[in-house]
């Protein structure tokens, strides 16, 4: 596990909204810079505290085997949402990165709830704030994300991603729940956050 600079984002404070050009860079640059940013869907959301990077050369990426109807959005322009169903149960949301055709994306794994918390509690059917968005399926349910959001731009309603304020202390480690390229240290998180899906070691 590696760590970078120390400083914490202020939960609830919003930086300027990110535009699509922010995502037109290497997935390995975008992923850590999303830590501390705020993801909102129709005003409901929170601070991003955990993400995973998936590059098109990565055997664990959905795009690794080529374009299909399911992953077509990954091959499109950067700055759009790629939504898929995991294990036939949970929706997961990714942000498409790099140049069109590069087919790389960042999976949003966990949020610290800050906006519309009561709406999240109603959707999730629980009160514990720490459990509302501590996993990709949980956060998608809490924010009301479904396949209807697949292919939508991230810089226009219902989405908004606001730039982080300050430079958070970021930790890295191997990704979770995959069997291919499981040792790649492409999982990024906010150091010390109790809202991540699984603690970093």
UniProtKB/Swiss-Prot annotation:
SUPFAM superfamilies: FMT C-terminal domain-like. It comes from the Bacteria. Its EC number is 3.2.2.-. CDD domains: AAG. The keyword Transcription regulation does not apply. PANTHER family: DNA-3-METHYLADENINE GLYCOSYLASE (PTHR10429:SF0). HAMAP family: 3MGH. This is Putative 3-methyladenine DNA glycosylase. It comes from Rhodopseudomonas palustris (strain HaA2).
